[in-house]
């Protein structure tokens, strides 16, 4: 007897979550392995007097977070989280990283023990012993195997079906390949590697570097300076991974889409860079710019810089990561934006 088709739930419906919903919704129509209806949990909001779930289910467009891109009709928006995840075999987590504890607490026990997850969340958390990966939190709270997906994937370009690559990291290769089957398209090409922790760290740390790149753009430093930010930022990413990853760190992972490719595209095209440039030019706070420029969505780079700063301070390692430290201090401790340049000039990579 054929196995029952696998039910998919997307936990999150922002810009990236909606772009991924478009891919999954279209793919499951063609693949008998997966159930034809995809549930998507939506944090309910009112847009122009209508519930966002009603707009998505009737107009098949997330007009707030992914306007201009139609979602497949088999993607069903649900505002009740417990109802959305009920009986799901595959969970795709794509929410701001600061909400992961609450979300996991709410759904633990409501999904089958055999369920598998994949996190597209770019961020880290602090634990009592220092670094805690988002995948670790999900794994510990829910008791399910969890893969990660990170790459050079600007959501609007993915939704427009422009070619890109991405990386899945999975400690159980079979599970990583299952998610590749669910997500891959001719224009969304996926490589699966087993160095999952490094893949996940790349996705979080590159946002800090992108903030630094945005500061340089705001100061009109030029492309040479931005290239230095990218190179030095990559060096700090590798050093951080070697210190804090539990398993072996493969330098080759940084050459995948999750590494240098994602770093480049985020430092040139991402919203962390864009908001950081505005921060440098206007003097407004990060919070003010989030409201003005991101439609209320949260920026991951500054928050991740704060978490990384506290982890490094706890371990007495701040002097080894001057770029990460400078981004935090400029965002939160009123250090002048020009401090980004002095950080580059005195970086230990040059001694």
Swiss-Prot record:
Binding of NAD(+), residues: 12-17, 155, 271, 298, 300
GO molecular function: glycerol-3-phosphate dehydrogenase (NAD+) activity; NAD binding; protein homodimerization activity
InterPro entries referenced in this protein's UniProt entry, alphabetically: 6-PGluconate_DH-like_C_sf, 6PGD_dom2, G3P_DH_NAD-dep, G3P_DH_NAD-dep_C, G3P_DH_NAD-dep_euk, G3P_DH_NAD-dep_N, NAD(P)-bd_dom_sf
Keywords, sorted A to Z: Cytoplasm, NAD, Oxidoreductase
Subcellular localization(s) per the UniProt record: Cytoplasm
GO cellular component: cytosol
Catalytic reaction(s) noted: sn-glycerol 3-phosphate + NAD(+) = dihydroxyacetone phosphate + NADH + H(+)
EC number, UniProt record: 1.1.1.8
Annotated Pfam families: NAD_Gly3P_dh_C, NAD_Gly3P_dh_N
Enzyme class, broadest EC rank: oxidoreductase
Main location: cytoplasm
Binding-site residues for substrate, renumbered to this chain: 122, 271-272
Domain of life from the UniProt record: Eukaryota
Role summary: Plays a role in regulating cardiac sodium current; decreased enzymatic activity with resulting increased levels of glycerol 3-phosphate activating the DPD1L-dependent SCN5A phosphorylation pathway, may ultimately lead to decreased sodium current; cardiac sodium current may also be reduced due to alterations of NAD(H) balance induced by DPD1L.
Record text on subunit structure and interactions: Interacts with SCN5A.
PANTHER family recorded: GLYCEROL-3-PHOSPHATE DEHYDROGENASE (PTHR11728), GLYCEROL-3-PHOSPHATE DEHYDROGENASE 1-LIKE PROTEIN (PTHR11728:SF7)
Family recorded in the similarity comment: Belongs to the NAD-dependent glycerol-3-phosphate dehydrogenase family.
Protein name: Glycerol-3-phosphate dehydrogenase 1-like protein
Gene: GPD1L
């Amino acid at each position: 007897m054929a196995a029952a088709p696998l039910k998919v739930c997307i936990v999150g419906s922002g810009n990236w979550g909606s772009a991924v919903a478009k891919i999954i919704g279209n793919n499951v129509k063609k693949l008998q392995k997966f159930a034809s209806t995809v549930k998507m949990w939506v944090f309910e909001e009112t847009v122009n007097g209508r519930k966002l779930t009603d707009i998505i289910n009737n107009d098949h467009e997330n007009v707030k977070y992914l306007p201009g891109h139609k979602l497949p009709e088999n993607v069903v928006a649900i505002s009740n989280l417990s109802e959305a995840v009920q009986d799901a075999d595959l969970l795709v987590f794509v929410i701001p990283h600061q909400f992961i504890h609450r979300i996991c607490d709410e759904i633990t026990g409501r999904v089958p023990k055999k369920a598998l997850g994949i996190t597209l969340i770019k961020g880290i958390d602090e634990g009592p012993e220092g670094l805690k990966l988002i995948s670790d939190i999900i794994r510990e709270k829910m008791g399910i195997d969890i893969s990660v997906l990170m790459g050079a994937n600007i959501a609007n370009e993915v939704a427009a079906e422009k070619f890109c690559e991405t990386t899945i990291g999975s400690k159980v290769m079979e599970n990583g390949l299952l998610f590749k089957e669910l997500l891959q398209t001719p224009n969304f090409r996926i490589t699966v590697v087993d160095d999952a922790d490094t893949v996940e760290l790349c996705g979080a740390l590159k946002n800090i570097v992108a903030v630094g790149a945005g500061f340089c753009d705001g100061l009109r430093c030029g492309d040479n300076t931005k290239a230095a930010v990218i190179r030095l930022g990559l060096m700090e990413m590798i050093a951080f991974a070697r210190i804090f990853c539990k398993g072996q760190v493969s330098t080759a992972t940084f050459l995948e889409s999750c590494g240098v490719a994602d770093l480049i595209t985020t430092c040139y095209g991402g919203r962390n860079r864009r908001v950081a440039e505005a921060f440098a030019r206007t003097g407004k706070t990060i919070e003010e710019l989030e409201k003005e420029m991101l439609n209320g969505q949260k920026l991951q780079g500054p928050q991740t810089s704060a978490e990384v700063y506290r982890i490094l301070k706890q371990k007495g390692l701040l002097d080894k990561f001057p770029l990460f430290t400078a981004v935090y201090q400029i965002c939160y401790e009123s250090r002048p934006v020009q401090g980004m340049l002095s950080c580059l000039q005195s970086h230990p990579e040059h001694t």
